[in-house]
Amino acid sequence: MSQTGAPPRWRNCPRRGQPVAGKFLPMKTMLGPRYDDKVPEENRFHPSMLSNYLKSLKVKMGLLVDLTNTTRFYDRADIEKEGIKYVKLSCKGHGECPTAETTEMFIRLCEHFIEKTPTELIGVHCTHGFNRTGFLICAYLVEKMDWSIEAAVAAFAQARPPGIYKGDYLKELFRRYGDVEDAPAAPPLPEWCFDEDEEEDGEEDGSASAPASEPSSSHTGQSKKKKERLKLGAVFLEGVSVKGVSQVTTQPKLGEIQRKCQQFSEWDRSGFPGAQPVSMDRKNIRMLEQNGYKVSWKADGTRYMMLIDGRNEVYMIDRDNSVFHIENLEFPFRKDLRIHLSNTLLDGEMIIDKVNGQPVPRYLIYDIIKFSGQPVGQCDFNRRLLCIEKEIISPRFEKMKLGQIDKAKEPFSVRNKPFFDIHAARKLLEGSFTSQVSHEVDGLIFQPIGKYKPGRCDDILKWKPPSHNSVDFRLKITKVGGEGLIPQTVGLLYVGNYDMPFAQMKITKDLKQYDNKIIECTFVNNTWVFMRQRVDKSFPNAYDTAMAVCNSIQHPVTKEILLEFLERCAQVQSRKNPADSDLMPPPPPKRSANSIPQ
């Protein structure tokens, strides 16, 4: 491993657990500021963060035991200046359990400290704070506090889930302090063990020998992706029942679909590969005059990619990377309607239109990445829009006219979403357009005309009225209060991988049902206000996303600012392309009862 890089699998490993037996705080190693250029801000763990955490708990740590085999991770002076005694107790790890001598030294050290200062915590860390750390804490609980080894292992697992996850460590603990036959099976490896973009060519503590640690069976040299998460019971399109849709949960089919979508999108990481827009602010709005853009309305829909891979092989992929099989949805080949499309990947959103008071689900296609194996995502956006209309929508319409597609059997309708030149934004916001759309419109999307880019895309801008700006948080309801104060129930709001709350909100009786759920909140009168639960998401917004939204709240791009800026852009564009200045956005197509819907 590079001497300047973070340890393997460290980045998304939880920073710390909860106190064990009121005495020990297990944690991973901290990394000093010298690693900041290697570690994203939301993943950092400086010594100062430990100090702030202890202050928030109103507890004091008097001793920190460092079990790693290196001194490069942080400066011990940053610990000692907080009045915490630092002790280095090197412990190999990597397939070697702590020796009897090391265990005895740890126990004597902690026993001596606790006798002198029984009210102060002892911090313990190895590289990740699970196996070596858990082993020695459990040994102390058994030898000095008369715990059974079963109770000690269970208590550590509860305080630092999933606990000790190396089977040989568990067996050695039970061999020393119980019956090795009673040793529990090692728990499944935690998700962070499968982190992508981690170096694997050296020991976690920075020495040069080859790694002997997990996860060898799942983390091959060919792929450094995280293990894909499986969300059982995923909901397809909240609020309406859609026939013929079922979640794909069996392997290898699930993995094959996920990998195909990632490969088609040229996404070399795990998770959902779709392009993600960023919030418009007063800085990035200038990209609209520097680059070519198209605009469309922002529907309050649910994001899905669609993989078309043959007859009865149509799949939808949501932002949690959950996969749904869609029955009775046909996509014929334009040049021969008897042939079904395959190797085709679309991007779009499911919306719920209101037609005669009844909910009607529709899929709006707004981009295409692959068509019959061809990388159309590399083409400019105008050509991709043409491809959607000509190769996806029109062949379906032709086959409907021939009576060869039974619309009544399809689970939902499929349409292409139109995009316009940016000067049409005023019509989209102020004209009769919104009244002619049968679903909720909550802003605008500005799409660059360049090639498709997977993941977060700083070029795709979403604009919402300042009153609609929102953040998706993970809500954790807890009681807070110091000595002599009445405990109060508050909602702590978390983003990204941070284990410190980003903000907090007042908790009502109705909000208690959303504990540990993802909720969308807006900022009103200097407080975060609940909008809705996001059942389509399992993770909160990233820290950078939340900060961008906060910036847009503090320095909003109002409708007036936006339209005035676009007016100037349109004048520049019309001088370059006079013929385009006459284009106006048509209203969404209104179809008669006798016409065939797309």
Curated annotation (Swiss-Prot):
Its EC number is 3.6.1.74, 2.7.7.50. It comes from the Eukaryota. It catalyses: a 5'-end triphospho-ribonucleoside in mRNA + H2O = a 5'-end diphospho-ribonucleoside in mRNA + phosphate + H(+); a 5'-end diphospho-ribonucleoside in mRNA + GTP + H(+) = a 5'-end (5'-triphosphoguanosine)-ribonucleoside in mRNA + diphosphate. One of its GO terms (cellular component) is nucleus. The active site is at residues 126, 298. Its main location: nucleus. The keyword GTP-binding applies. It is found in: Nucleus. Residues 1-215 are annotated as: TPase. Keywords: GTP-binding, Hydrolase, mRNA capping, mRNA processing, Multifunctional enzyme, Nucleotide-binding, Nucleotidyltransferase, Nucleus, Protein phosphatase, Transferase. One of its GO terms (molecular function) is phosphoprotein phosphatase activity. Residues 186-227, 575-598 are annotated as: Disordered. Bifunctional mRNA-capping enzyme exhibiting RNA 5'-triphosphate monophosphatase activity in the N-terminal part and mRNA guanylyltransferase activity in the C-terminal part. Catalyzes the first two steps of cap formation: by removing the gamma-phosphate from the 5'-triphosphate end of nascent mRNA to yield a diphosphate end, and by transferring the GMP moiety of GTP to the 5'-diphosphate terminus of RNA via a covalent enzyme-GMP reaction intermediate. This is mRNA-capping enzyme. It comes from Danio rerio (Zebrafish).
